[in-house]
């Protein structure tokens, strides 16, 4: 299995948990708790990526990025966003040329 397929497999497993459930499944637990719990986990894990990126341990960063991807896929399934939707959007974006956004004001100046 190549690396791209692992994300598709992850999506399919999470979708199956949503549709069929599985006893003692963390994924099932998230779906049972609902969107607020899922969003809380996405926020927590994203913060952990930021902290890990500031530190020097690459393995910690990799682990935290994987946690974010997992929780984002749970969110996608909860909101009925298909993996194909994401792939299509990414393909559209990579074809754009000259799409640099204007500089934003620094947060310190707000």
From Swiss-Prot:
SUPFAM superfamilies: all-alpha NTP pyrophosphatases. Keywords: Amino-acid biosynthesis, ATP-binding, Cytoplasm, Histidine biosynthesis, Hydrolase, Nucleotide-binding. GO terms for molecular function: ATP binding; phosphoribosyl-ATP diphosphatase activity. Its EC number is 3.6.1.31. It holds the Pfam family PRA-PH. GO terms for biological process: L-histidine biosynthetic process. Pathway: Amino-acid biosynthesis; L-histidine biosynthesis; L-histidine from 5-phospho-alpha-D-ribose 1-diphosphate: step 2/9. One of its GO terms (cellular component) is cytoplasm. It comes from the Bacteria. Transmembrane segments: none annotated. It catalyses: 1-(5-phospho-beta-D-ribosyl)-ATP + H2O = 1-(5-phospho-beta-D-ribosyl)-5'-AMP + diphosphate + H(+). It is found in: Cytoplasm. InterPro entries: HisE (IPR008179), PRib-ATP_PPHydrolase-like (IPR021130). It is an enzyme of class 3 (hydrolase). HAMAP family: HisE. Belongs to the PRA-PH family. PANTHER family: HISTIDINE BIOSYNTHESIS BIFUNCTIONAL PROTEIN, HISTIDINE BIOSYNTHESIS BIFUNCTIONAL PROTEIN HISIE. This is Phosphoribosyl-ATP pyrophosphatase. It comes from Clostridium novyi (strain NT).
